[in-house]
UniProtKB/Swiss-Prot annotation:
Active site (catalytic residues): H70
Organism phylogeny: Bacteria, Pseudomonadati, Pseudomonadota, Gammaproteobacteria, Lysobacterales
One Pfam family here: FabA
Gene: fabA
Sequence similarity: Belongs to the thioester dehydratase family. FabA subfamily.
Protein name: 3-hydroxydecanoyl-[acyl-carrier-protein] dehydratase
Keyword field: Cytoplasm, Fatty acid biosynthesis, Fatty acid metabolism, Isomerase, Lipid biosynthesis, Lipid metabolism, Lyase
Amino acid sequence: MSRQHAYSREELLATARGELFSHSNARLPNDPMLMFDRITGIYADGGSHGKGIVNAELDIRPDLWFFGCHFLGDPVMPGCLGLDAMWQLTGFFLTWSGATPGYGRALGCGEVKFTGQVLPNAKLVRYEVEMTKIINRTLVIGQANARMLVDNREIYFAKDLRVGMFNNTESF
């Protein structure tokens, strides 16, 4: 199966509407919760574990919605949004790889470190997600390590991010 290796914002928003992948009902969040503008590379066999990688970018502008409310007079991107982007990308990888139809849900992570912040004068956030394990049974679970860089400086690191793909989320 030939797969695309980069995605535009329009294609990512099509995923939010359930229009991009015919084999799955998994979706990315819609605006404003979609936390990246494009996927610049996604590969099934990359990374130090050979399980796959996905890289994405978010263009930073002073008018992004979160700067107006977090915090008044001290605008900063909430750390949880960067972490959520890492979960979004892990779930996107599972859907892209054809693992299973299902609804993606964040299941946790082993470790998170914040060593910097995203301010309105920044230009670019990059996400680098490296898959470390994929369990494909009744429940598909993806595990990844990820880092977030602002203007080429690493500011977040997450280890053992976990995303599950559920056929039914009512009992979750």
